Amino acid sequence: MKKIVSLVLAALLVLSLAACGSKDNASDGNPVWPTSALNVLETVWNTYGEDEKFAVAGGDFSEANAREDAPGVFDLKDRALADSELGLPETAEVDEAASLVHMMNANTFTAAAYHATGDTAELAQQLRDNIMQRQWMCGVPDKLIVAEVGDEYVVTVFGADELVDTFMTHLNGIYGVSAVHTAYDEAIL
């Protein structure tokens, strides 16, 4: 009887340890790749645990794109608004944008994703320079991170250290450190 119980317990242990093994994010074993700027932010936000989430709004302020508690599309027709709200230079070579912003204060957390139509490294530099030169009101964000995701997407995130770090942990966890190149990780002074 003891042998049977021991074998059953050993089998349960082996099965439970096997269940803890690594899993790919994609169901077919292939790495996950972004399909749009919005997809980047939605994929990251959807991996947050309930204890990590906070009140957010996404998209621009149009009726079609504004979203509560989720990322949203940011229409690029008004480039001055995209510059003011997200730090996207008006001359940047992008054809898609999406945003996810802390509902109480954008300086606490703002994330944006862009589909680059030009060089992602150049876009990352433009975004970094444009955001770092801002005059902040209602508090200064702690830090800025600009990351290239694959060959076509650039993500910016600025705000409180803990919120920015959590976002980057999820971004790297989804796309992998081989696909996410952190171009800039700087304190905002």
Predicted regions and their residues:
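Positively charged n-region of N-terminal signal peptides that target proteins for export
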Residues: 1-4, 8-11
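C-terminal motif of bacterial Sec signal peptides marking the signal peptidase cleavage site
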Residues: 15-19
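Soluble, non-membrane globular domain cores that form compact, hydrophobic packing
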Residues: 21-110, 116-189
